[in-house]
């Protein structure tokens, strides 16, 4: 492969005309991208998909061979050897040919392959993110001057890509550009201790000083006292109150009303678009953000499919679990020291108030509230239910974070319904998560003593 001359490529793409706000030339860039992919023996569309979505794009399907290699190789030197071997033999999965082992490539050849590969990745980023000519020119200059290509050969893609982006002045982008995060818990860890000093009070309610509320003639003060100026101590005290009031998330009934209405609306909607946490500038929005996410992921249940049929599978006559819809705790679990999972103490959903009572009843109205979070949104769920033709049971834990169970060897104390026909009893079992799938098979594992007793 020919060595990559980044300044010449930039001028060839129309970057020498001084149009700083224009985008990099389209036709020339597409032609260069096509030539690079043909030289590397990789598919042009597959290269663009890999830069945009990563290997996750091919989940459930077979990814191209070069994608599997670049994600599997310990360092990019091995991947460069693979591409050069494909180039010499005239094929890989993209060309349909067999890969024949040949001599090891030289360092110069490996660097040229790596430069061509990252140049192709960069062109996809420029086109997808509509990068201007001035920014692209700076990136090309840094590629020729600041990127240590020999060092990148010794790194895997997960470390080489951020190092290349930082050296090329493209640190604001990542590889892949679009990251689908299936575990929101990693994003939310530490939000509880996030500094909120930058928050702004959108609708502050201020109470004016007494001498500013009414005209002097309408004030209940002696004549002449209304015009008395405030002392330096009074001014300092008022300033301190105003400064402290900007970061206090209470005292504004309008904000509380808007927050409650917004939460009710989002809870009733099928889809909700939430802002990035870095763009949130008010306490109301911040609390609403964490509240609606908690509403959707906090749950005490593990749903387990049943491998044998039972009558009453629609939940009729089954025991009910009473659950707070906002904090996700089961409110009729009972007292005891249960083995359970929990959030990290710095997590935003960590509940420090492990109270003895689960429910609080208002003496005036008789309304029932959750003693953990104070919400009155309480729901009931049957421990036996059916989805289509599949029967399920709900295993109820003592915490609200069933979503954090990721290890099949984790042991939990779970309340499970008896699988006896028309039986409404429940059982307390300490089981590992992996054993839950075997409890619903034939056997005495999920039957109460009454159902196990032989009938005479």
UniProtKB/Swiss-Prot annotation:
Gene Ontology BP terms: viral process
Protein origin, superkingdom: Viruses
One GO location term (cellular component): viral tegument
One Pfam family matching this protein: Herpes_UL49_1
Recorded family membership: Belongs to the herpesviridae UL49 family.
Protein name: Uncharacterized gene 66 protein
């Amino acid at each position: 492969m020919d060595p990559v001359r980044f300044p010449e490529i930039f001028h060839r793409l129309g970057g020498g005309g001084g149009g700083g706000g224009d985008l990099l030339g389209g036709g020339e860039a597409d032609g260069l991208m096509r030539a690079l992919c043909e030289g590397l023996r990789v598919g042009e569309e597959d290269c663009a998909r890999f830069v945009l979505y990563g290997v996750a794009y091919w989940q459930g399907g077979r990814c191209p061979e070069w994608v599997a290699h670049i994600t599997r190789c310990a360092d990019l030197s091995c991947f460069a050897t693979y591409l050069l071997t494909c180039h010499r033999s005239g094929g890989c999965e993209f060309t349909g040919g067999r890969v024949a082992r040949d001599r090891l490539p030289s360092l110069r050849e490996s660097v040229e392959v790596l430069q061509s590969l990252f140049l192709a990745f960069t062109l996809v980023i420029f086109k997808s993110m509509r990068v201007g000519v001035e920014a692209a020119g700076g990136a090309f200059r840094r590629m020729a001057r600041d990127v240590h290509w020999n060092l990148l050969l010794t790194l895997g893609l997960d470390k080489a890509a951020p190092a290349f982006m930082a050296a090329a002045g493209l640190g604001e982008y990542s590889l892949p550009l679009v990251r689908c995060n299936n575990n929101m818990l990693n994003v939310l860890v530490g939000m509880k201790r996030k500094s909120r000093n930058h928050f702004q009070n959108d609708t502050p309610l201020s109470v004016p000083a007494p001498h500013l509320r009414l005209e002097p003639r309408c004030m209940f003060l002696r004549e002449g006292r209304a015009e008395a100026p405030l002392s330096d101590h009074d001014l300092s005290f008022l300033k301190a109150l105003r400064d402290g009031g900007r970061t206090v998330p209470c005292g504004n009934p309008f904000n509380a009303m808007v927050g409650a209405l917004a939460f009710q609306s989002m809870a009733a909607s099928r889809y909700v678009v939430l802002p990035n946490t870095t763009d949130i500038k008010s306490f109301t929005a911040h609390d609403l953000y964490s509240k609606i996410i908690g509403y959707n992921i906090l749950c005490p249940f593990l749903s387990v499919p049943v491998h044998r049929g039972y009558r009453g599978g629609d939940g009729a006559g089954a025991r009910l679990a009473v659950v707070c819809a906002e904090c996700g705790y089961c409110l009729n679990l009972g007292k005891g020291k249960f083995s359970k999972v929990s959030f990290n103490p710095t997590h935003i959903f960590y509940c420090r108030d492990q109270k003895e009572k689960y429910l609080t009843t208002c003496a005036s109205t008789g309304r029932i509230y959750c003693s953990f979070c104070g919400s009155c949104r309480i729901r009931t769920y049957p421990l036996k239910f059916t989805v289509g033709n599949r029967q399920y049971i709900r295993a109820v834990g003592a915490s609200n974070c069933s979503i954090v169970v990721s290890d099949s060897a984790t042991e939990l104390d779970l309340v499970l319904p008896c699988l006896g026909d028309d039986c409404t009893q429940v059982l307390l079992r300490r089981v590992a998560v992996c054993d839950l799938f075997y409890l619903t098979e034939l056997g005495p594992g999920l039957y109460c003593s009454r159902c196990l007793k032989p009938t005479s």
